[in-house]
């Protein structure tokens, strides 16, 4: 399965990890210096959930991000799914 949230459309994107060396100025050094940057992939926090939709009277199984779960808790499952176009 793809790593995409069906509510928000969140998907993996590229990021960087920065490697630093040296002692911080606060600790008496001359400062931290960037020695290398490494490409990495940042993944969304996806959860596979069974959401109860009272209007339909059944569970709907979906792969959603943690932020989308908060949206469902705030606006209700039926309204959120209808707005996205899944119902």
Swiss-Prot record:
Disulfides per UniProt: none
GO BP annotations, alphabetical order: translation
Pfam family, one: Ribosomal_L28
Keywords assigned by UniProt, alphabetized: Ribonucleoprotein, Ribosomal protein
InterPro entries, per the entry: Ribosomal_bL28, Ribosomal_bL28/bL31-like_sf, Ribosomal_bL28_bact-type, Ribosomal_bL28_sf
Ribonucleoprotein is among the record's keywords: yes
Keyword Cell membrane attributed: no
A GO CC term assigned to this protein in UniProt: ribonucleoprotein complex
Gene Ontology MF terms: structural constituent of ribosome
HAMAP family according to UniProt: Ribosomal_bL28
Family recorded in the similarity comment: Belongs to the bacterial ribosomal protein bL28 family.
Protein name per the record: Large ribosomal subunit protein bL28
Organism of this sequence: Akkermansia muciniphila (strain ATCC BAA-835 / DSM 22959 / JCM 33894 / BCRC 81048 / CCUG 64013 / CIP 107961 / Muc)
Lineage per the UniProt record: Bacteria, Pseudomonadati, Verrucomicrobiota, Verrucomicrobiia, Verrucomicrobiales
């Amino acid at each position: 399965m793809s790593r995409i949230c069906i509510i928000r459309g969140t998907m993996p994107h590229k990021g960087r990890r920065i490697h630093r060396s040296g002692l911080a100025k606060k600790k008496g050094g001359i400062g931290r210096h960037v020695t290398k940057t490494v490409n990495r992939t940042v993944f969304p926090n996806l959860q596979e959930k069974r959401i109860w939709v009272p209007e339909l009277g059944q569970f709907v199984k979906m792969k959603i991000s943690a932020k989308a779960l908060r949206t469902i808790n705030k606006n209700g499952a039926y309204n959120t799914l209808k707005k996205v176009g899944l119902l």
